[in-house]
UniProtKB/Swiss-Prot annotation:
Changing residue 68 to G: In strain: 221. Heme c binds at residues 34, 37-38, 83. This is Cytochrome c-551. Coiled coil: none annotated. The keyword Iron applies. PROSITE patterns: CYTC. Residues 1-22 form the signal peptide. SUPFAM superfamilies: Cytochrome c. It comes from the Bacteria. Electron donor for cytochrome cd1 in nitrite and nitrate respiration. Binds 1 heme c group covalently per subunit. It comes from Stutzerimonas stutzeri.
């Protein structure tokens, strides 16, 4: 029993130390500057997040590409106004990308 319990406790502790993984995508979206230019349903400075999800539905590698755009910024994807780099970690960018792509 001890041989199983100790690794399980260690794994639980390691996961607890990664707050970005525990955060919900929507809460992360609201805590970062994303909402200054984007909303879920309505185009603002940037596209509505549901538009982004629809455009990328079924596209292989979309989550990775979107995560890179979120972290590093992009230009010319949705119009002439560039998206600046965002103060997010790679993990947070991935969480945000997966959340955006899950929107219907």
């Amino acid at each position: 029993m001890k041989k199983i319990l100790i690794p399980m406790l260690a794994l639980g502790g390691a996961l607890a130390m990664q707050p970005a993984l525990a955060q919900d995508g929507e809460a992360l979206f609201k805590s970062k500057p994303c909402a200054a230019c984007h909303s879920v349903d309505t185009k603002m400075v940037g596209p509505a997040l549901k538009e982004v999800a629809a455009k990328n539905a079924g596209v292989e590698g979309a989550a990775d590409t979107l995560a890179l755009h979120i972290k590093n910024g992009s230009q010319g994807v949705w119009g002439p106004i560039p998206m600046p780099p965002n103060p997010v970690t790679e993990e947070e960018a991935k969480i945000l990308a997966e959340w955006v792509l899950s929107l219907k």
